């Protein structure tokens, strides 16, 4: 499950123009087109960071429905929409802490879309297996 997520993460590091060109050139099924549209939409203006982001609101933005979009996440990542967004946010936090260990963790959690400290810490521990402080101690 995490392998699929990290493979997707690597693909997302491709600049938008190259990704859009690759998508346009490749023959795709309607499921592939939806998935490509989902990934581009999440990256556009960093929608994945929005605290208001929900499967329902995101599906509406795509002019689709929550079941179809949710199924696309399961099919392509073996994760639910919420799990994918959680991993994406925590992965951003981890990478930022590795490069800037002195950053204010509360501001960083807020930046990636967490309103509640307890939710951010719980999700960080769930994804990484350690608290943010334990993580910082390991990388220092």
Describe the residue ranges of each PLM region.
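Membrane-proximal linker segments that couple transmembrane helices to downstream signaling/catalytic modules
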Residues: 5-110, 123-126, 130-140
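The DNA-contacting recognition helix of HTH DNA-binding domains
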Residues: 66, 116-118
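ABC-family nucleotide-binding domains
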Residues: 113
């Amino acid at each position: 499950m995490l392998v699929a997520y990290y493979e997707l993460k690597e693909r997302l590091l491709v600049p938008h123009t190259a990704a859009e060109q690759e998508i346009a050139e490749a023959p795709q099924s309607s499921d592939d087109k939806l998935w490509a549209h989902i990934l581009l939409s999440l990256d556009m203006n960093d929608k994945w960071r929005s605290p208001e982001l929900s499967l329902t609101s995101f599906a509406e933005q795509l002019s689709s429905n929550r079941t179809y979009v949710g199924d696309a996440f399961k099919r392509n990542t073996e994760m639910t929409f919420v799990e994918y967004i959680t991993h994406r946010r925590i992965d951003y936090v981890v990478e930022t802490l590795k490069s800037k260990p002195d950053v204010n963790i509360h501001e960083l959690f807020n930046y990636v879309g967490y309103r509640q400290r307890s939710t951010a810490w719980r999700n960080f521990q769930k994804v990484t297996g350690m608290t943010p402080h334990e993580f910082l101690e390991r990388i220092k």
